[in-house]
């Protein structure tokens, strides 16, 4: 829960200001920072909360009992996923991302442990890699087109922003793959 609280500073602090106005790009006009910070706090909290509940319900259905550890990994997964898009999505996008994160973390942790036979005692791959990857792609799906980010596929932006996000994750994966050899 400490990490959940700290992500308000991490994500919210990225807005640079919590109140007042700042000069817009190019020195023309002003923009209100309070509304952006409030949106960032709301989407961060909603995604994490929904991911926690979905991970708990998913494990309860799958294993016939709730799994506290997996539920808390769901919290972290939601926080990781929403970090990429928290300033450019609405509450609906945050809710959908939370659902995706809650299911993805359980499935990827199980895949790594049982299929790949890799010892990942804290589920770091499922929490950070899988949900970071998916969260970056979700920008291209759920972005509302605000704050300098193009609109996502489901918000009338077509495939442009999705293509940019996919190029980004492929480039990072290639870079990591090459440098880890």
Where are these regions (language model features)?
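Glycine- and aromatic-enriched membrane alpha-helices
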Residues: 1-181
